[in-house]
C-alpha cells in the first residue's frame, strides 16, 4: 500500500519539537536503531521494505505496518540515505527522582544545544553503563530526530530527564558533584565515586555560573572536544 501524502507530511512534521510534544512521539530510522527500540518503546506505526519486513519475526504487536519501496521510503524519510525502515514510537514517561544520583553515577547536561551532541552523549553514557541523564530545560530535545539517530540505540537504555539543575543538585545529600572544566583533574586519573553527578556544559559557554557554584569536584575530560562540548 502506498504511503499517503498526509502520512508523509506527518512524518516530516516530527522535525518540530512542538509537534513531537503534542503527539508524544519520536521518529527513528534504519534497521539497527529501529530493531533496538522495538523491544523498549511502544510503536505507533512502522514502514519498511519487503526485504526488511521479511527478516523480522517480532512485529505482531504493531498494529500499523506498511510495506514500502525504497523510493517511497525516501519520500518519507528525513535522512539523506534512507535505510529499509522508519518507525514512529511513543515517548516514554519517566519519573524524575533526583535521589537516583545518591545511589548511582548520573550525568547532568547544562544547556547542551546541539541535538547530535546530545545523542552522542547518550550513546557514550550507555557504553559506560550510566542509566540516567538530567538535562537543564534549555538543553536540546532528546527526541529531535538528529539526537535519536546519534544515540545509536542508547536511548533504549538511558533515561533522559529535564529539570532545574540547581534545584536538583541542592536536593542531594552528601554526593559528589563533578563538573567538567579545562582546569580540572584528568578524569582518567581520578577515582570516581559510584554515585553522584558528572556535569557537562554548553558547547561554547561551558557550565553556567549558577550550576558551577554547586560543583564540589572539578574534572577535565581529554578529547571531549571531539563531540564539541
Roles of regions detected by a PLM:
Residues 32-34, 52-53, 72-73, 93, ...:
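Alpha-helix capping/helix-boundary segments
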Residues 179-224:
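Active-site/ligand-binding-proximal alpha/beta "capping" segment
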Residues 98-183:
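RNA substrate-binding interface of SAM-dependent RNA methyltransferases
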Residues 66-88:
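Glycine/small-residue-rich loop that forms an oxyanion/phosphate-binding "nest" at active or ligand-binding sites
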Residues 227-229:
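Conserved small/polar residues in nucleotide/adenosyl-binding loops
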Residues 1-52, 140:
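Boundary-proximal intrinsically disordered activation/regulatory segments immediately upstream
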Residues 26-28, 44-50, 160-161, 176-182, ...:
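Short, hydrophobic beta-strand segments that form beta-sheet elements in well-ordered domains
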Amino acid at each position: 500500500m502506498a504511503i499517503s501524502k498526509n502520512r508523509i507530511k506527518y512524518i516530516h512534521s516530527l522535525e518540530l519539537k512542538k509537534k513531537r510534544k503534542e503527539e508524544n512521539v519520536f521518529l527513528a530510522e534504519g534497521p539497527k536503531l529501529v530493531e533496538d527500540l522495538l523491544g523498549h518503546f511502544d510503536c505507533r506505526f512502522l514502514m519498511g521494505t519487503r526485504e526488511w519486513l521479511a527478516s523480522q519475526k517480532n512485529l505482531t504487536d504493531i498494529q500499523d505496518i506498511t510495506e514500502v519501496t525504497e523510493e517511497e521510503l525516501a519520500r518519507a524519510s528525513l535522512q539523506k540515505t534512507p535505510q529499509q525502515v522508519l518507525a514512529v514510537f511513543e515517548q516514554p514517561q519517566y519519573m524524575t527522582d533526583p535521589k537516583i544520583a545518591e545511589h548511582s553515577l548520573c550525568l547532568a547536561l547544562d544547556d547542551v544545544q546541539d541535538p547530535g551532541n546530545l545523542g552522542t552523549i547518550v550513546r557514550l553514557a550507555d557504553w559506560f553503563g550510566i542509566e540516567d541523564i538530567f538535562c537543564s530545560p534549555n538543553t536540546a530535545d532528546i527526541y529531535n530526530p538528529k539526537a535519536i539517530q546519534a544515540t545509536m540505540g542508547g536511548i533504549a537504555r538511558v533515561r533522559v530527564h529535564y529539570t532545574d539543575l540547581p534545584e536538583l543538585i541542592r536536593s542531594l545529600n552528601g554526593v559528589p558533584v563533578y563538573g567538567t572544566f579545562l582546569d580540572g583533574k584528568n578524569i582518567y586519573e581520578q577515582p570516581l565515586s559510584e554515585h553522584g553527578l558528572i556535569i557537562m556544559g554548553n558547547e561554547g559557554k561551558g557550565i553556567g555560573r549558577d550550576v558551577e557554584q554547586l560543583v564540589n569536584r572539578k574534572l577535565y575530560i581529554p578529547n571531549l572536544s571531539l563531540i564539541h562540548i
